[in-house]
Design a protein with these regions (language model features):
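Small-molecule kinase domains that catalyze NTP-dependent phosphoryl transfer to phosphate-bearing small molecules
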Residues: 41-42, 100-145
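Post-Walker A helix-loop "phosphate-sensing" segment adjacent to the P-loop in P-loop NTPases
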Residues: 25-31
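ATP-dependent NMP and nucleoside kinases share a basic, alpha-helical "lid"
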Residues: 54-97
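Short, amphipathic alpha-helical "lid/cap" segments that border enzyme active or binding sites
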Residues: 45, 49, 144-152
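Conserved beta-strand scaffold positions in the cores of enzyme catalytic domains, especially
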Residues: 30, 77-79, 134-136
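Pre-Walker A (Motif I) flank of P-loop NTPase domains
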Residues: 1-5, 58
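ATP-dependent small-molecule kinase phosphotransfer cores
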Residues: 34-59
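Glycine-rich phosphate-binding P-loop
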Residues: 7-22
Length: 158
């Protein structure tokens, strides 16, 4: 089966780590913003969507970039949304970026607002609406390993 997993997430969650661990367990590549933007001839959403559709011709994990919406009509696409407690996200950002609590909180709020605007602008939908995903995971509750186990367990039932 040509399984494609899309992972949408709030800024500061462990979604990148979840994607990497899934990649190792499933033996498929992860494509993120940096990879996708590197493949673009221009920065239009339509071009980005074409790149994502091309990547989805083979088993892979796509992190962000409205991939769940871009691939919504394709078979064998499994959409995951990762969220986490705001304070947990701030703590992760503080550690990763060496920021104060206030700086990390500001970065989180700015990034979340930008992601919400980008998603709405390009899809007409509300970012983070769990109705757009097969599975929503709070990694504050289950951790990175728990999230990976949940996703793998869900996939075993498909």
């Amino acid at each position: 089966m040509n399984l494609v997993i899309t992972i949408s997430r709030r800024f500061g969650t462990g979604a990148s780590l979840i994607a990497q661990e899934l990649s190792e367990k499933l033996g498929v590549p992860v494509y993120d913003k940096a990879y996708i933007e590197h493949e673009l001839d221009d920065d239009s959403y339509a071009t980005e969507a074409e790149v994502i559709k091309g990547l989805a011709e083979h088993p892979c994990i796509i992190l962000g970039r409205c991939a769940s919406e871009i691939l919504k009509d394709q078979p064998n696409v499994f959409n995951v949304y990762v969220c986490a407690d705001k304070e947990d996200r701030i703590e992760r950002i503080m550690k990763k970026e060496s920021l104060s609590h206030d700086e990390a909180k500001e970065m989180l709020e700015k990034n979340d607002a930008e992601r919400a605007a980008y998603y709405y602008e390009n899809t007409g939908k509300v970012w983070g609406d769990v109705n757009n995903y097969h599975l929503a995971i709070d990694d504050s509750e289950v951790g990175i390993d728990g999230a990976v186990k949940l996703i793998l367990e869900y996939l075993n039932h498909l």
